[in-house]
Structures are given as structure tokens and as C-alpha cells.
Swiss-Prot record:
Enzyme class: transferase
Region (LID): 122-159
Organism: Chlorobium chlorochromatii (strain CaD3)
Catalytic activity from the UniProt record: AMP + ATP = 2 ADP
Superkingdom, natural source: Bacteria
Compartments, record wording: Cytoplasm
Job description of the protein: Catalyzes the reversible transfer of the terminal phosphate group between ATP and AMP. Plays an important role in cellular energy homeostasis and in adenine nucleotide metabolism.
Name this polypeptide is given: Adenylate kinase
GO molecular function: adenylate kinase activity; ATP binding
Length: 218
């Protein structure tokens, strides 16, 4: 089984990707991890990708596809894979089909933007320990202070409302065409078209996980 998992920042994709991979015995492939590992191992493609990333540029689809094909050839991927954060563009999706890497399911964890802004902009952290709080869902005993040390909590720059909204705009611009691409493949009855599942991402971790499992097992 090969699954693509989509979800906006703050939609809970990271939590659910682990559960899906464990439940179905899949190897999780994250392009970010894959690029970092290839560079760390000193592979030519990895070093080339690192040079591009260090220059602040986007790694080409050709390099990413070559690394993905290499990953898929490994024994640990023989039982199936979960693509986390890939594809990001129509070009990458078409490259998968051109390489005859057939996807069985595309799962999008959907959460409204207002809810994501509320989730992410409410996060507060104690930098020294990494302890995390939320002003609404998991507040500290004393507002703005770490429970254990009494030291001030901070909001990371990535979690500011303005930054979260910008990240959501980028996500929607990338993902909307992908969703349309995969739903059209399914509607046209194209050969090896994956099934697309839009999963409501509001609820407990267990509720959302069960919705995903039910969709994939139906």
C-alpha cells in the first residue's frame, strides 16, 4: 500500500502519520528527512541537494524523485510507504505516475484555517526545557509562567498569528491544485488512480485516527 498524507501546518499530520505507518506496517517517507539523511550519509545526490538548500534554493524534482526511487528500492519499503509532505506540486505528482509509482490513497486531514490559527498562535514554550503549553487547551498554572520553574513562557516566531496565516496561504496555494489533480484522476476512472479521502481533523487524536483508519480500510 502507498499513501500520500496531506494536511496544513497544525492540522495534526505529524501525530497521525506515525499512527498510520505503525497500523498498516508502512515505511514513512518524509522528503525533509530523506534529504537530510542523504546529505549526512555523503551520497552524491544528498550532497548536491545540501548545496542547493544551503543556498536557499528549492531542490529540483529530478533530485527528489531520484532519492525517492532509491528509498523505494530498499527492503524496508517493500511492505508499503506513507509519503509525508510529498508531492507538493502537480509536477511531482505527475513524476510519480511517469515512474509508475502507483498511489493507492490520498488522505487530506482538513481543519478550517480559523481553528489552525487558534491552535498554533496559542502555543507557548519554556525554551530551556522544551515544555509546551497552550493558552486555551493546556494553560500553565500561572499565566505566562512555566509550571516547574516559574520562568517566563514565550511564543515562537513561527507561531505568531501573522506567520501562521502566511504558512496557510502557501499550503493552500500548493495543495488545492494537488487535491483537484487527484480527485479528477479518480472521477475520470484513470488507471491506477488513487482514492481521495478528506478527513475532518477536529476531535481527539483517537477520533481522527479512527476516521482515517475507517477510510483506508473501507
Amino acid at each position: 500500500m502507498k499513501i500520500i498524507l496531506l494536511g496544513a501546518p497544525g492540522a495534526g499530520k505529524g501525530t497521525q502519520s506515525t499512527s498510520i505507518a505503525e497500523h498498516f506496517g508502512l515505511q514513512r517517507i518524509s522528503t525533509g528527512d530523506m534529504l537530510r539523511n542523504a546529505a549526512k550519509e555523503g551520497k552524491p545526490l544528498g550532497l548536491e541537494a545540501k548545496k542547493i538548500m544551503d543556498a536557499g534554493q528549492l531542490v529540483s524534482d529530478d533530485i527528489i524523485m531520484a532519492l525517492i526511487k532509491e528509498c523505494l528500492s530498499k527492503d524496508e519499503c517493500s511492505c508499503g510507504v506513507l509519503f509525508d509532505g510529498f508531492p507538493r506540486t502537480i509536477g511531482q505528482a505527475e513524476a510519480l505516475r511517469a515512474e509508475e509509482i502507483h498511489i493507492d490513497h490520498v488522505v487530506e486531514i482538513y481543519v478550517q484555517d480559523e481553528e489552525i490559527v487558534k491552535r498554533m498562535s496559542g502555543r507557548r514554550v519554556h525554551l530551556a526545557s522544551g515544555r509546551s503549553y497552550h493558552v486555551m487547551f493546556n494553560p500553565p498554572k500561572q499565566e505566562g509562567l512555566d509550571d516547574a520553574t516559574g520562568e517566563p513562557l514565550v511564543q515562537r516566531a513561527d507561531d505568531s498569528e501573522e506567520t501562521v496565516k502566511k504558512r496557510l496561504q502557501i499550503y493552500h496555494a500548493q495543495t488545492a491544485p494537488l487535491v483537484e489533480y487527484y480527485t479528477m484522476l479518480e472521477q475520470k476512472g484513470e488507471s491506477n488512480a488513487p482514492r481521495y479521502h478528506k478527513i475532518e481533523g477536529v476531535g481527539t487524536v483517537e477520533e481522527i485516527r479512527n476516521r482515517i483508519f475507517a477510510a483506508l480500510e473501507s
